Amino acid sequence: MKYLLFTLVSLTIYPLLSDLTNWSLYNHKVVHSNTNRSKLKYEGDGVKVYVNNNFDIYIFNPNKVTFGVSSSRPSGKKFYMNSNFFNKRAIGLVVENGVQKSRRVSGGGYFYVSGNQVNVQRGSCPQNTDYASQTILWGIDNGVTNKSLMRQRHAKQLTYRNIVGKNKNGDIIFIVSNFGGVVTIKDVIEEGVRQGIVEGVLFDGGTSVEYKFKDGWYSTSFTALSDAGKKISGFGKPTTYIYVN
């Protein structure tokens, strides 16, 4: 009985302690540092993983992996990342297995899969897709960065962020904050440029950042705010995930 009680308490307290650690860094300019050089941490079939002091970087070859969008947290996938807000309903277009789950909104950009083609682009998405996830923010369009977005007040706030894009070879790239990687939108867009992204969109950052990777001997994950923390804070659960398999 004591062991059961200890286990239950541990399962409740540990995620909250993790949240406290994650957010003790939040908006603290003293911990913000320029992004250093990325190092290759893992290379598998169709994927390379690089890490630096602010970001984890996942580069996928679309000829060797498959992509999708799920309205619930995926299991058994190589990689997944939350791609929407913590609302009861998703914001923007969401398509899962060819079924539209949420309507598109104006502006922003899209990650989508149509047949054997996976794409990331600003502004438009085909009417008929197998999978799609929309964001209200775009960061890089045909190699040009969104300087107007970078100048906005919210863009200068230090928080956990991400950018999803493709390079000139068609590889799909996920750049996501790791533990302590509180950055501005300018920081994450510039990292996208360094990694060769020519089309890139930004999905919700801050408490929304959540991802997991597992392939071969290498695994890593990061959740900016645990499920317990979301419940206490009044946030809903994520409604949309992009995944790779």
What are these regions (language model features)?
Residues 1-19:
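Classical Sec-dependent N-terminal signal peptides that target proteins to the secretory pathway
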Residues 13-245:
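Gly/Ser/Thr/Pro-rich low-complexity, intrinsically disordered segments
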